[in-house]
Regions:
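Extracellular glycan-interacting surfaces
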Residues: 1-364
Length: 364
């Protein structure tokens, strides 16, 4: 709740964590309702309140009913369409202009320039470069753009740091991974963090111009390699919530999946990161974080057999793997990434146990 410093009878309040409806301009034709918080105003010191959330609180003007507030305006940020003002308790009156307010949200900042008008109040998205999004994965395609995987908002195609990025369409909610094929960067996949409503994942063969649905593709990380016959093999690892390091592959563009063999796992293991040698598509790396979370039933502290990083290498395009233990796993969950320094030259992290240089396709 906040007060207008120039008139303490004018108060604004908002909810935090309410799951209710907010309207966009196509509500009457496309049911464009977003679900989030409500905001209210009072002009009599809080004795009476008006719900000024778009789509709420009809007012009587002449012979017709009108909503007090207009539908939310995207303000040129197309990706925010259909998304709500939510997960935020901040509401601020501009001290230089009490007609203007700012509200924080889980996806950025919303503003209004005429909050005290009798009707026609207009809320609009106004992040100005500070969208609050969670990047779960990101790739930079050689000779192309950068592509992100974003929690809640799928992801974006980033072509210019000074321009608003384009969001993937169709949109599928929280995306955990984005990957491209190093032998043909036009081939890409993005996979859902959960089994989302739109699809568990999409693939493209034309650099993102069109996306096609995959089946049962949700998971943690992703990779692609090109087979000898020119077709593509997709990989996905289990999501961290599954507590397994398992890796799966698909030879039919993500419609069916088989389990890769040779990947060690126990209940409690973390999701596995994969990497393809660009000039040797048969060489697939899988960096495994093995963790048996039941160790405490039989010992005072875990040892190497319970918790370790293992680098697994495949020479048959990712069907079967052979693993080499690298170091003790110390529960630094971000240590499983693979950094590529050039052909047969990798760097892998092991938390408090340092970094390791890997050469000779994992032999050294």
């Amino acid at each position: 709740i906040t007060a207008d410093k120039s008139d303490p009878n004018k108060l604004l309040a908002r909810t935090c964590g309410l799951w209710s409806d907010q309207w966009y301009e196509e509500e009457w034709t496309e049911t464009s309702i977003a679900w989030g918080d409500h905001f209210f105003r009072s002009t009599d010191g809080g004795e009476n309140w008006t719900d000024i959330t778009p789509g709420q609180q009809e007012g009587q003007y002449t012979d017709n009913h009108y909503f007090v507030s207009e539908p939310i305006d995207t303000n040129g940020y197309a990706w925010i369409y259909g998304k709500a003002v939510h997960w935020g308790s901040g509401i601020l009156i501009d001290p230089r202009n009490s007609d203007k307010i700012l509200m924080t949200s889980g996806n950025g900042v919303f503003a209004c320039d005429n909050v005290w008008d009798e009707k026609g109040i207009q809320f609009y998205f106004d992040p100005a470069g500070i969208e609050e999004v969670v990047a779960l994965d990101m790739v930079s395609v050689p000779g192309g753009s950068a592509y992100s995987a974003i929690g809640d908002y799928d992801g974006f195609i980033h072509t210019d740091v000074n321009e608003i990025p384009e969001q993937y369409q169709p949109n599928m909610g929280s995306t955990s991974a984005i990957a491209y094929c190093p032998q043909n960067p036009d081939v890409m996949i993005r996979i859902a963090k959960d089994q989302n409503d739109t699809a568990p994942g999409f693939y493209t063969l034309d650099g993102g111009k069109t996306w096609n649905k995959m089946a049962n593709a949700n998971g943690g990380r992703a990779a692609i390699t090109q087979l000898e016959d020119g077709s593509y093999r997709f990989f996905k690892s289990a999501h961290e919530n599954d507590k397994t390091s398992a890796v799966f592959y698909s030879d039919d563009l993500g419609q069916t999946w088989e389990t890769c063999t040779g990947i060690p796992s126990a209940y409690g293991s973390k999701m596995t990161n994969m990497f393809i040698e660009p000039n040797k598509p048969n060489i697939v790396y899988a960096y495994v974080t093995y963790y048996n979370e039941s160790w405490f039933y039989s010992k005072d502290k875990p040892d190497m057999s319970d918790a370790h990083y293992t680098l697994c290498v495949s020479t048959d395009y990712g069907k079967t793997f052979t693993g080499t233990d690298v170091a003790m796993y110390d529960q630094c969950d971000s240590a499983g990434r693979i950094a590529y320094l050039g052909e047969d030259n990798l760097i892998i992290g092991a938390g408090w146990y340092g970094m390791y240089s890997v050469t000779d396709n994992g032999k050294t």
